[in-house]
């Protein structure tokens, strides 16, 4: 290993350590534990910070109270909407920032670790929620689990970007979106002027 390879590895270690700690914490999240319940003040604040940070300060937070409404909102989400485009721009920016710190291989390995650590506990807890809500459609269950994996990926990109002291992770929309999962919710998405939250 030459000097430049050692330098590159040294630059990657702090970000990889953050990703590892984050990955271990994912197993303790109460995935989908509060679906359909009234919002706590913390969850309401996270929802507001998410919509504000994404550029939709006028979006109303709509708490979906049953699985059918959540599934319908998820299935009819406009993937070319202004909210989707705003998230994609943020994701692209964060990925670029991450690649300033990590090699493509290191980022890929870290993201694979995150996905592995989210998918199983989220799937298990979605099975419990599905039993409670009497949901048999596996495709609908997978929508929620996929959203959890995506939110964890987005939050991990924020963690890597925060290695740069000039980047503020406080109140970043992806951080707030992930916090909603930490509150046991499923942020289904913004459609028109409504943020659907189950």
Predicted regions and their residues:
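Short, glycine-biased loop/turn motifs at secondary-structure junctions and
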Residues: 1-198
